């Protein structure tokens, strides 16, 4: 079985047996025997697509047509991950998608559901929190040329953030490098630029690991994609307002703003990172088209689309401060309340901090300096949800309202 060395930094010493593509990274060590998983073999579903021939040193993978490249995707059943898989397939890439045996909100999707949803990608069911199992499950299906990590903790709890946003993401990097990946795309978040929450600190810690690996190995590159708000995170009140209730916001509704981006547009931007050399070894903040919108403007838009007079409930932000203060105090006495306190801080953060680029010169969030991409608008999304509901856009454990 593969021996995987974990640390807060990717080690720079050790030995490795060469892979078909190039020597495996030095933080992975392979004995001379084949990798085997204890117990039953991995649960695997495949479209019977053969692995690609490895790209030679004289012909980097970016010189190959998409049809001759394989991209590893973890978090493939998540909100953005599914669209990334579909977009890569649409562009002709071979996709190796990692999924849990039960996925979706509250694990409602079976393995057969996942295989059908991601077809014709090759799907490997594995556990990204178990580095040895992940590598063993993926090893028979390499090599890969690039990897995309769309993993994210479900609710942002303290332990879960470090388990998923850092360690499981690190396991993805280790497995991808062991399979020969020359480029790694990380789906991060624009809010990490002002890290006050555990999941932000965990994501930043991995971003450091990624940059360190690129500095160690010049043949390896990365792209860190930091999107603004997703459409679904702004759609939770559509049905409430549609049913005649007021729109709820904090303060005067102008405390924060964002340039929301659709899942399709974000997936296309992530797919661009696979081949676009200009996006290599860069942190890439990205928002959707148009100007930044405050909660007040979002609410006004929704009432206009419904043809109704605006009705708002404005909640003082100080209420959240009081709740957080109480939960923080209780968490010191009762550690089981640690996540409840963290969830309160997450709600407070999103109620008051803009999902825009933080201008280092002014220390202020900047609409103008936040890059825009794509064609889908929040207004189009609201129109669709008014007609069809939030099917496929459920918030699950991210629900605030």
From Swiss-Prot:
Free-text function comment from the UniProt entry: Catalyzes the conversion of divinyl chlorophyllide to monovinyl chlorophyllide. Reduces the 8-vinyl group of the tetrapyrrole to an ethyl group using NADPH as the reductant. Can use (3,8-divinyl)-chlorophyllide a (DV-Chlidea) > (3,8-divinyl)-chlorophyll a (DV-Chla) > (3,8-divinyl)-protochlorophyllide a (DV-Pchlidea) > (3,8-divinyl)-magnesium-protoporphyrin IX monomethyl ester (DV-MPE) > (3,8-divinyl)-magnesium-protoporphyrin IX (DV-Mg-Proto) as substrates.
Alphabetical list of Gene3D superfamilies matching this protein: NAD(P)-binding Rossmann-like Domain (3.40.50.720)
Lineage of producing organism: Eukaryota, Viridiplantae, Streptophyta, Embryophyta, Tracheophyta
Protein name, per record: Divinyl chlorophyllide a 8-vinyl-reductase, chloroplastic
Region (Disordered): 1-26
Gene Ontology molecular function, alphabetical: 3,8-divinyl protochlorophyllide a 8-vinyl-reductase (NADPH) activity
The reaction(s) this protein catalyses: protochlorophyllide a + NADP(+) = 3,8-divinyl protochlorophyllide a + NADPH + H(+)
Alphabetical list of SUPFAM superfamilies matching this protein: NAD(P)-binding Rossmann-fold domains
Main location: plastid
Record bears the keyword Cell division: no
Keyword annotations from UniProtKB, A to Z: Chlorophyll biosynthesis, Chloroplast, NADP, Oxidoreductase, Plastid, Transit peptide
Subcellular location: Plastid, Chloroplast
Enzyme class: oxidoreductase
Transit peptide (residue range): 1-54
Enzyme Commission (EC) number: 1.3.1.75
Compositionally biased intervals (Polar residues): 1-10
Pathway in which this enzyme or protein is active: Porphyrin-containing compound metabolism; chlorophyll biosynthesis
GO CC, any one term: chloroplast
Gene Ontology biological process terms in this record: chlorophyll biosynthetic process
């Amino acid at each position: 079985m593969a021996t995987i060395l974990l640390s807060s930094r990717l080690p720079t010493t050790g030995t490795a047996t060469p892979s078909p593509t190039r020597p495996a990274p030095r933080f992975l060590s392979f004995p001379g025997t084949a990798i085997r998983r204890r117990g039953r073999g991995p649960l695997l579903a495949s479209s019977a697509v053969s692995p690609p021939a490895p790209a030679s040193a004289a012909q980097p993978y970016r010189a190959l047509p998409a049809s001759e490249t394989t991209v590893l995707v973890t978090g493939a059943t998540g909100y953005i991950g599914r669209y990334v898989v579909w977009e890569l397939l649409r562009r002709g890439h071979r996709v190796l998608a990692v999924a849990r045996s039960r996925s979706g909100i509250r694990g409602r999707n079976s393995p057969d559901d996942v295989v059908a949803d991601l077809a014709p990608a090759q799907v490997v069911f594995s556990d990204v929190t178990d580095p040895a199992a992940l590598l063993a499950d993926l090893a028979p299906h390499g090599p890969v040329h690039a990897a995309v990590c769309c993993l994210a903790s479900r609710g942002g709890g303290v332990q879960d953030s470090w388990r998923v946003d850092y360690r499981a993401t690190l396991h993805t990097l280790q497995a991808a490098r062991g399979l020969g990946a020359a480029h790694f795309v990380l789906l991060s978040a624009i809010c990490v630029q002002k890290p006050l929450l555990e999941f932000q600190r965990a994501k930043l810690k991995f971003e450091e690991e990624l940059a360190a690996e690129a500095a160690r190995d010049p043949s390896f590159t990365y792209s860190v994609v930091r999107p603004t708000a997703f459409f679904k995170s702004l759609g939770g009140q559509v049905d409430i307002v549609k049913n005649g209730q007021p729109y709820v916001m904090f303060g005067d509704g102008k405390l924060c703003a964002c340039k929301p981006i659709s899942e399709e547009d974000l997936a296309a931007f992530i797919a661009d990172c696979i081949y676009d050399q200009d996006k290599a070894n860069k942190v890439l903040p990205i928002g959707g088209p148009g100007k930044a919108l405050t909660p007040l403007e979002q609410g006004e838009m929704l009432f206009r689309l419904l043809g109704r007079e605006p009705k708002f409930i404005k909640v003082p932000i100080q209420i959240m401060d009081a709740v957080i203060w109480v939960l923080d105090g209780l968490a010191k006495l009762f550690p089981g309340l640690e996540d409840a306190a963290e969830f309160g801080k997450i709600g407070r953060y999103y109620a008051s901090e803009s999902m825009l680029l933080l201008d280092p010169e002014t220390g202020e969030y900047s609409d103008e300096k936040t890059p825009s991409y794509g064609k889908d608008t929040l207004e189009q999304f609201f129109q669709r949800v008014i007609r069809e509901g939030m099917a496929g856009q459920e918030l699950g454990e991210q629900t605030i309202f």
